[in-house]
Amino acid sequence: MIALIQRVTRADVRVGGRTTGEIGAGLLALVCAERGDTEAAADKLLAKLLGYRVFSDAAGKMNLPVSNIDGEGRAGGLLLVSQFTLAADTNSGLRPSFTPAAPPDEGARLFDYFVAAARARHPIVETGEFGADMQVSLVNDGPVTFWLQVRP
């Protein structure tokens, strides 16, 4: 499973002109299930995402997770957006292959599982809509962007 995470000062996702998810300071995570991924992989990726220390502490070092973005216990937002293109095979030719991505029904099931698990563990979780044509707006803080990937 893959998550491309970006530290943001704000982010939102819109579908068909309506906002489906919006956060202030926190993390925007573009999330992709790959063929063979399991709930265990989703749990492992979520634990990494929630614990990843990308927010600055008082000394200015990236040392704080999304659950404590200011060093005083304030949780940041988490905006989860499904994006199967993260699994693209770009090794040959000029057109990406999406064979490595989980089939749509399995991808939807794992994304829903990931979102439910995130909501059980973090107070501020917003989402896009799986499989929809979405418009994502963000202000990347830093910029700070990381590729997280776990194998089943």
From Swiss-Prot:
Cellular component, GO, one term: cytoplasm
GO molecular function, one term: Gly-tRNA(Ala) deacylase activity
Top enzyme category: hydrolase
Compartments, record wording: Cytoplasm
SUPFAM superfamilies from the UniProt entry: DTD-like (SSF69500)
Main location: cytoplasm
Alphabetical list of Pfam families matching this protein: Tyr_Deacylase
Motif (Gly-cisPro motif, important for rejection of L-amino acids): 142-143
Keywords on record: Cytoplasm, Hydrolase, RNA-binding, tRNA-binding
Record has Hydrolase as a keyword: yes
PANTHER family referenced in this protein's UniProt entry, alphabetically: D-AMINOACYL-TRNA DEACYLASE 1, D-TYROSYL-TRNA TYR DEACYLASE
Subunit note: Homodimer.
Protein task: An aminoacyl-tRNA editing enzyme that deacylates mischarged D-aminoacyl-tRNAs. Also deacylates mischarged glycyl-tRNA(Ala), protecting cells against glycine mischarging by AlaRS. Acts via tRNA-based rather than protein-based catalysis; rejects L-amino acids rather than detecting D-amino acids in the active site. By recycling D-aminoacyl-tRNA to D-amino acids and free tRNA molecules, this enzyme counteracts the toxicity associated with the formation of D-aminoacyl-tRNA entities in vivo and helps enforce protein L-homochirality.
Name the record gives this protein: D-aminoacyl-tRNA deacylase
Organism placement in taxonomy: Bacteria, Pseudomonadati, Pseudomonadota, Betaproteobacteria, Burkholderiales
Name of the gene encoding the protein in the UniProt record: dtd
